[in-house]
């Protein structure tokens, strides 16, 4: 008699065996790497990388830099710095993560002496992640506030003070008085003139610029900003709720790791382009738009600016930070690629997309600002802003003057939301990837609790940034953590991989993935990796040290303890570089010279993660999947691949 077939609902255990396991649900059946998982599709990876690279800076920093550095002329140093600094580092990090299938800390099995560089990258990413989600919370608040028939910052209201005005305000004027029968003309405060029913003499008025309604709304309503960092105040409850919502969105998108975030980015990475196109089309139809675009990249371009070193420094700095190199995220995201993926073409696509997006965003921004300048009777130079002032003061002010202002405001802030979210996805993935590499068994069983736990801890740490002094904290972290630490990590990354591990050896590793290339293909990359890119990064680092100034927010200086805290944050991030180097040297054997030499050799478990990809060069490497060898081993006796 034939064996009875079991009903389908009895086959759940059998199905689990086929598809990795219920504990390891972030790994798909067809994944090449059944331990860590891979991207479901190539497009998941590309959109995640584009979303990570294209962030808020592309919208609120690049257009202003272009305008202030000669307009269209700025694109020349920008393109040159992309080729000399941005793309070489981007390609290197993508290749590094993909080759070893490891995150930014464990990937330093390539050079155990420099493992602290990876820790520095992750710590800086953590600090930046804390305040970056606060900016997303600001965007959420403004988006919700826009769901009204009239934007709340369109006019001065009960929350504003006497300085709220779109036109200059009279502060003093001359009045005619009679004293003991003698007529006198004296200068008085305008408030005194009004109280005493005097009239200003025509032409005697002294003016000061008024504060736009959008500026007072930002400071008095949205932030409830205190007088300085010394005055913490209370937690602004609606910003705290928006921050919580932002973290809930991030946690929900990452609960299955790259398997879930790789689907969400189809919306978060592509939607900003739709909004930018809509804003550009709308802006181009407005009166004065052509003047704004002319200031941005047209007839106002000043090629004499190319003689100024500041312009080249700004171009290099913008490229370096906008591509998100040396943050650890590129290594983390690339570690989930299949081994034979063409990371070279990916690097080209993402870098070009990032730069073209910056240029495109500038047209959308300046067309609207040109219209704002036109209706207010000002020059474009008087209304253009950068950073927070552009996103939450200048642009909202311009949108408030448009017919259907709430609709355009909702679109704009929803775009900022999506721009921030996919950058945040990659930053959190950097943290969870680091945990996964260090504790793989724990991560398989507890990916969801660990991911949500990270989000919860970072939310709690971010609450200080939604107090009445929150904006000062945001600016402080950005000023210290998102600067020198990243430059130091990038310089040491190049020195370690190219000069110590060996640029030629790294090229051989890369060719195992993308195939052998002719010598002329690598000529450019060798020139950049060995000489040009390190020199540029060192020059930027020295320049930033020379140009360092105490942080301030507007005209408000930071207290001494705030500056000291900023230095403590950056020292905490980079101190792990010497600490880990000392630990590795202590773990090694022999005299100090022998220990140093052994620490500069790859660990015994460095190489392709899967045995099928190791070939002759890595046939003797220790299997990284074995628990005993998962941690970076003592480097004495490390194998040096031929």
Swiss-Prot record:
Residues 1-44, 584-642 are cytoplasmic. It is a multi-pass membrane protein. One of its GO terms (molecular function) is branched-chain amino acid:sodium symporter activity. Residues 622-642 are annotated as: Disordered. Glycans are attached at residues 155, 163, 174, 189, 197, 202, 230, 302. Keywords: Amino-acid transport, Cell membrane, Glycoprotein, Membrane, Obesity, Symport, Transmembrane, Transmembrane helix, Transport. The chain crosses the membrane at residues 45-65, 72-92, 110-130, 235-255, 261-281, 315-335, 348-368, 399-419, 450-477, 480-500, 528-548, 563-583. One of its GO terms (cellular component) is membrane. GO terms for biological process: (R)-carnitine transmembrane transport; alanine transport; amino acid import across plasma membrane; amino acid transmembrane transport; amino acid transport; beta-alanine transport; glycine import across plasma membrane; response to toxic substance. SUPFAM superfamilies: SNF-like (SSF161070). It is found in: Membrane; Apical cell membrane. Residues 131-234 are extracellular. Belongs to the sodium:neurotransmitter symporter (SNF) (TC 2.A.22) family. SLC6A14 subfamily. Transport inhibited by BCH (2-aminobicyclo-[2.2.1]-heptane-2-carboxylic acid). Amino acid transporter that plays an important role in the absorption of amino acids in the intestinal tract. Mediates the uptake of a broad range of neutral and cationic amino acids (with the exception of proline) in a Na(+)/Cl(-)-dependent manner. Transports non-alpha-amino acids such as beta-alanine with low affinity, and has a higher affinity for dipolar and cationic amino acids such as leucine and lysine. Can also transport carnitine, butirylcarnitine and propionylcarnitine coupled to the transmembrane gradients of Na(+) and Cl(-). It is linked to Genetic variations in SLC6A14 may be associated with obesity in some populations, as shown by significant differences in allele frequencies between obese and non-obese individuals. This is Sodium- and chloride-dependent neutral and basic amino acid transporter B(0+).
């Amino acid at each position: 008699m034939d064996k009875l077939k079991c009903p389908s609902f009895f086959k759940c255990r059998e199905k689990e065996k086929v598809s990795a396991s219920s504990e390891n649900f972030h790994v798909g059946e067809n994944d090449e790497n059944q331990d860590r998982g891979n991207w479901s599709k190539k497009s998941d990876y590309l959109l995640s990388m584009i979303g990570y690279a294209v962030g808020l800076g592309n919208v609120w920093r690049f257009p202003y830099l272009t305008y202030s550095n000669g307009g269209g002329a700025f694109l020349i140093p920008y393109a040159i710095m992309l080729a000399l600094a941005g793309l070489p580092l981007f390609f290197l990090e993508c290749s590094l993560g993909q080759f070893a299938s490891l995150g930014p800390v464990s990937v330093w099995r390539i050079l155990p002496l420099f493992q602290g560089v990876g820790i520095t990258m992750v710590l800086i990413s953590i600090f930046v992640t804390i305040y970056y989600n606060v900016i997303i919370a600001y965007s959420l608040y403004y988006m919700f506030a826009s769901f009204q028939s009239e934007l709340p910052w369109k006019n001065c209201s009960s929350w504003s003070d006497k300085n709220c005005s779109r036109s200059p305000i009279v502060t003093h004027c001359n009045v005619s008085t009679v004293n003991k029968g003698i007529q006198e003309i004296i200068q008085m405060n305008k408030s005194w003139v009004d109280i005493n029913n005097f009239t200003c003499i025509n032409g005697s008025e002294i003016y000061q610029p008024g504060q736009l309604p959008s500026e007072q709304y930002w400071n008095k309503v949205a932030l409830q900003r205190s007088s300085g960092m010394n005055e913490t105040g209370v937690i602004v409850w609606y910003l705290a709720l928006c921050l919580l919502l932002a973290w809930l969105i991030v946690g929900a998108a990452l609960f299955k790791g790259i398997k879930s975030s790789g689907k969400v980015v189809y919306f978060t990475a592509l939607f900003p382009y739709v909004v930018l196109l809509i804003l550009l089309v709308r802006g181009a139809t407005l009166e004065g738009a052509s003047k704004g675009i002319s200031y941005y990249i047209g007839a106002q371009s000043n090629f004499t600016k190319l003689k100024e070193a500041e312009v080249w420094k700004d171009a290099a700095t913008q490229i370096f930070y906008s591509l998100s190199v040396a943050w650890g995220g590129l290594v983390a995201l690339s570690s989930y690629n299949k081994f034979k993926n063409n990371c070279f073409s990916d690097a080209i696509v993402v870098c070009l997309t990032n730069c073209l997006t910056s240029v495109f965003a500038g047209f959308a921004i300046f067309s609207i600002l040109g219209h704002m300048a036109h209706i207010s009777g000002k020059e474009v130079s008087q209304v253009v802003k950068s950073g927070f002032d552009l996103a939450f003061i200048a642009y909202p002010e311009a949108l408030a003057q448009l017919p259907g202002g709430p609709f355009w405001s909702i679109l704009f802030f929803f775009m900022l939301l999506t721009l921030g979210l996919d950058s945040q996805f990659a930053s959190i993935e950097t943290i969870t990837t680091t945990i996964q590499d260090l504790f793989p068994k724990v991560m398989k069983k507890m990916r969801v609790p660990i991911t949500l736990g990270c989000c919860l801890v970072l939310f709690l740490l971010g609450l200080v940034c939604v107090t009445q002094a929150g904006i000062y904290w945001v600016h402080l972290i950005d000023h210290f953590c998102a600067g020198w630490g990243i430059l130091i990590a990038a310089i040491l990354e190049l020195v370690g991989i190219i000069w110590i591990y060996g640029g030629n050896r790294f090229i051989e590793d890369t060719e195992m993935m993308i195939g052998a290339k002719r010598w002329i293909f690598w000529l450019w990359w060798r020139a950049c990796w060995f000489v040009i890119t390190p020199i540029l990064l060192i020059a930027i680092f020295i320049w930033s040290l020379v140009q360092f100034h105490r942080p301030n927010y507007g005209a408000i200086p930071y207290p001494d303890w705030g500056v000291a805290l900023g230095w403590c944050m950056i020292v905490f991030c980079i101190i792990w570089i010497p600490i880990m180097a000392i630990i590795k040297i202590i773990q090694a054997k022999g005299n100090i010279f022998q220990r140093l030499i052994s620490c500069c050799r790859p660990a015994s478990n460095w190489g392709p993660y899967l045995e099928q990809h190791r070939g002759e060069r890595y046939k003797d490497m220790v299997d990284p999947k074995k628990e005993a060898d998962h941690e970076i081993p003592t480097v004495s006796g490390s194998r040096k691949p031929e």
